């Protein structure tokens, strides 16, 4: 019995496999989507003002997304799951309360 316990295998779990997928400190997909929207705004309007506005809006949104990821890196996935389950789990004070 003692021999079986001493011969345990150790498997390393790499940190990259358990970390959330972030880009610039925010959710990767949301940063890329907002960057795409800013680039589309810049190249569709093609003025200096639209370029400045697009860059400023993107920087502000990335800042907000970083604050969101700092509080909970998986907040987007949790919110999407919350929206999908909303019809099934009504917001009540008790699960046994009648509607």
UniProtKB/Swiss-Prot annotation:
Membrane topology value: Multi-pass membrane protein
Localization, UniProt: Cell membrane
Cross-referenced InterPro entries: Conjugal_tfr_TrbD, T4SS_VirB3/TrbD/AvhB
Pfam hit, one: VirB3
Signal peptide span: none
Keywords per UniProt: Cell membrane, Conjugation, Membrane, Plasmid, Transmembrane, Transmembrane helix
GO cellular component: plasma membrane
Transmembrane segments: 21-41, 42-62
Primary location: membrane
Family named by the database record: Belongs to the TrbD family.
NCBIfam families, per database record: PRK13823.1 (NF010395)
Protein name according to UniProt: Probable conjugal transfer protein TrbD
Species this protein is from: Sinorhizobium fredii (strain NBRC 101917 / NGR234)
């Amino acid at each position: 019995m003692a021999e079986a316990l001493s011969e345990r295998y150790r498997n390393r779990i790499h940190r990259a496999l358990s970390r959330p997928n972030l880009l610039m400190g925010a959710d990767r997909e949301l940063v890329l989507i907002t960057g795409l929207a800013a680039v589309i705004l810049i190249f569709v309007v093609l003025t200096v003002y639209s370029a400045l506005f697009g860059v400023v809006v993107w920087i502000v949104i990335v800042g907000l997304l970083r604050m969101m990821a700092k509080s909970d890196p998986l907040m987007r996935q949790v919110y999407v799951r919350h929206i999908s389950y909303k019809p099934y789990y009504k917001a009540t004070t008790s699960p046994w309360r009648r509607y």
